[in-house]
A protein has these predicted regions:
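C-terminal reverse transcriptase regions that engage the nucleic-acid substrate
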Residues: 1-109, 268, 277
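Mobile genetic element proteins and their domesticated derivatives, centered on retroelements
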Residues: 2, 27, 50, 58, ...
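Eukaryotic intrinsically disordered and solvent-exposed regulatory patches
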Residues: 36-37, 129-134, 150-154, 182, ...
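RNase H-like nuclease fold core
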Residues: 50, 138-190
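Alpha-helix capping/termination and helix-coil
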Residues: 54, 90-97, 117-122, 151-155, ...
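RNase H-like nuclease module associated with reverse transcription
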Residues: 71-74, 143, 182-343
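Flexible loop/turn segments at secondary-structure boundaries
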Residues: 72-73, 106-108, 153-156, 174-175, ...
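Structured nucleic-acid-interacting core domains from mobile-element enzymes and related host factors
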Residues: 88-150, 215
Length: 343
């Protein structure tokens, strides 16, 4: 990627920036001149390279690329400058790799699903639909953790929000989703319900996927969101719908929670991992609370030693991991964990 950048612009990427885009940036408001045909090809090439980076694990730039890819047909000079910044950010943090943690997250302090009476609600008493033709489960069970978020009026021209969902197997992120919503919501409450519907769809997919692979799945999925009003409306049978046009998402989320295997809980925004999939985040706060605990990064290998018995690297006194917890129980301490690094 860096060599292609050098070929296009005859210079190395500027690596002074510590985030993909400036916090609170709105590229749709850019009024700089349009690019010519040759520059458009370069712009599309940069977007394609960045999308490839996302597919191999660099989802910290996904919100920026989701936004910038909308302008591929007619990009402006300011859009090209923003893409150059994203490439510079990737080159600056080129050592970022996903940490693979295979031990179970500690949710001992997390409250369980409240014993609400869903049987006498409109959803009735029903359980999870488990595939009958799945192979018998073998091996260590997997605990699934999901984070979801919505960014209201991400695009100020259309008023549309962005949905962000991230799924963890044990303590490892394996699936990330970032997409602009198709409708313009008038309140965060409605945008969060659309994101809640998406995370429920993801839960169904991942649990079925693991069962068909023959892996035992934990009887409960942990789902974290930062809009308490939406979560209360979803988890309490007596709650009322505040926005009628969200009625389908409202009933879908509540019907899934009534099955008893989704534990949807509130979490502070600064610990919500899906926040980086919905907003143009800044370095301060976001990097240390969300980015650093998930990615292996240059300079943290001093805390690693090679354990010949495990044949993997083991982290000692990993403060970033202790901060992570896996973000759900908010700063719960972790035991030293096995780490395997991939690109």
């Amino acid at each position: 990627m860096e060599e292609a950048y050098l070929q296009h612009f005859k210079e190395r990427p500027n690596q002074k920036h510590q985030s993909p885009l400036q916090k609170g940036d709105h590229p749709e408001l850019d009024t700089t001149p349009f690019l010519d045909e040759k520059e458009i090809e370069i712009y599309m090439s940069l977007v394609g390279s960045a999308q490839w980076s996302i597919s191999i694990g660099r989802f910290d730039i996904q919100t920026a690329i989701m936004t910038m890819s909308k302008f591929r047909s007619a990009p402006r000079r300011g859009h090209l400058d923003r893409m150059k910044r994203v490439i510079g950010y990737l080159c600056k943090f080129r050592h970022f790799m996903i940490r693979f943690r295979v031990d179970e997250p500690d949710y001992s302090n997390v409250p369980g699903i409240k014993n609400h009476d869903w049987e006498h609600s409109v959803y009735g008493k029903h359980e999870e639909d488990v595939p009958l033709n799945a192979p018998p489960p073998l091996g260590k069970r997997i605990i699934l953790t999901h984070y979801f978020d919505a960014s209201l009026m991400h695009d100020v021209l259309s008023g549309k929000a962005v949905t962000g969902v991230c799924t963890f197997y044990q303590k490892t992120p394996v699936d990330w989703f970032c997409k602009q919503q198709s409708t313009s919501e008038t309140a965060t409450y409605g945008a969060e319900f659309l994101s809640g519907r998406k995370v429920c769809e993801k839960i169904i997919d991942h649990r079925a996927y693991l069962r068909y692979l023959g892996k035992p799945v934990c009887e409960m999925d942990y789902v974290w969101g930062d809009n308490e009003s939406m979560i209360n409306s979803s988890t309490i049978p007596d709650s009322k719908l505040h926005k009628r046009h969200n009625i389908l998402s409202f009933h879908f989320v509540r019907s899934m929670i009534s099955r008893g295997y989704i534990n949807m809980l509130h979490i502070d925004t600064k610990y919500n991992f899906a926040d980086i999939l919905t907003k143009h985040w800044g370095y301060q706060g976001t990097y240390y609370e969300l980015i650093q605990p998930v990615f292996h990064h240059e300079g943290n290998t001093a805390a690693l030693f090679l354990d010949d018995t495990l044949e993997v690297d083991v982290s000692i006194n990993d403060e970033e991991s202790m901060r992570f917890g896996i973000l759900g129980s908010e700063r719960t301490s972790l035991q030293p964990h096995a780490v395997t690094l991939v690109v």
